């Protein structure tokens, strides 16, 4: 799908699940990816850059081989066979024998440019045991810029989309007044 971000970052939450867990972790390696294409703010272009990577790694993809009860186990939930212990007792039980904890895919983007994301599930070698991805509803996020005037009793916050021109006018203070603008992280703009 194509999208146009409203800020300089995008993110969304997902869970990867598979019936390959745990019996086939070493035999078959079902994997998936969220592949981003479009302008890279650091220069050049993203060309099918995988956003589905294990947190804290540079480019290790989320797969049954890389996330399980031994590897990156902090991100793994054992669901047994889906019917017997230690299955997840949550009322939203699924048949997958294991799945990841909710993970977040994120990327730096150029506000206002067009991007493309391709979602791919690779059911490696066998077709008997399924794997799937669950996207959290409403989690695809590209925040708008918030500008706040907190200098007086009449404070306001303006949500500004990218490529929007605004004029800020400061009144008072006389000729000796010195104004500085900071972003939400208190960096001087």
Outline where the language-model segments fall.
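Extended extracellular/luminal ectodomain segments enriched in beta-structured repeat modules
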Residues: 3-11, 112-114
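Structural beta-strand segments of beta-rich domains
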Residues: 8-10, 164-168
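Short amphipathic, basic-aromatic surface patches that mediate peripheral association
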Residues: 14-24
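Exoplasmic/lumenal beta-rich domain surfaces
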Residues: 25-111
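Short, solvent-exposed loop/linker segments at the N-terminal edge
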Residues: 111, 155-164
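Short beta-strand-plus-loop segments that form exposed binding edges in beta-rich domains
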Residues: 120-128
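Proline-enriched interdomain boundary motifs that mark the N-terminal boundary
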Residues: 143-156
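Surface-exposed, flexible coil segments in extracellular/virion-facing regions
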Residues: 167-189
């Amino acid at each position: 799908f194509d999208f146009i971000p409203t800020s300089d970052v995008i993110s969304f939450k997902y869970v990867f699940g598979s019936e390959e867990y745990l019996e086939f972790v070493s035999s078959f390696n079902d994997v998936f990816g969220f592949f981003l294409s479009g302008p890279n703010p650091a220069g050049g272009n993203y060309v099918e850059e995988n956003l589905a990577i294990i947190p804290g790694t540079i480019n290790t993809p989320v797969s049954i081989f890389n996330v399980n009860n031994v590897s990156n186990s902090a991100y793994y939930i054992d669901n047994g066979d889906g019917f017997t212990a230690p299955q997840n007792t949550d009322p939203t039980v699924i048949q997958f024998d294991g799945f990841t904890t909710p993970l977040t895919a994120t990327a730096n983007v150029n506000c206002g440019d067009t991007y493309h994301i391709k979602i791919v599930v690779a059911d490696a070698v066998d077709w008997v045991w399924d794997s799937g991805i669950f996207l959290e509803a409403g989690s695809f996020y590209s925040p708008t810029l918030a500008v706040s005037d907190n200098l007086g009793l009449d404070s306001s916050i303006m949500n500004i989309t990218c490529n929007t021109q605004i004029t800020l006018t400061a009144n008072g203070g006389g000729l000796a007044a010195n104004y500085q603008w900071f972003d939400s992280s208190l960096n001087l703009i």
